[in-house]
Amino acid sequence: MSREILHPPGWARARGYANGVAAEGRQVYVAGQIGWDAEQRFVSDDFAAQVRQALANIVAVLACAGAKPEHIVRMTWYVTSRDEYNASLAEIGAAYRELIGRNYPAMSVVVVAGLLEPRAKVEIEATAVI
């Protein structure tokens, strides 16, 4: 895969994400992943624990296509609470670095009123290019 981080001249440095990514190769689309395990049981009601599980689920789906976390070029996070997200940033960052590494794709975080699964606090979609 060839990949280029897009950063307009004069813009402040993006922290923890890229403003854009240009990539060539096989595309892999990962549906929204939530904080439940392979048996569709929630691992925790803790926000950071649900993020960690959702990220682990993304890594597992990517592996089915022969992709790795470094192939991720875009992520969209849907969170049910801005406050819980912000309060958990240190733990989220640690889980992200452990599971995804220091790959910072184009990324959006959207606060939503709720998710389909009532216990879900976060849902993360990913696109990868191999």
Task: Give the residues covered by each predicted segment.
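Short, polar/acidic, helix-capping and beta-turn segments at strand->helix junctions
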Residues: 2-130
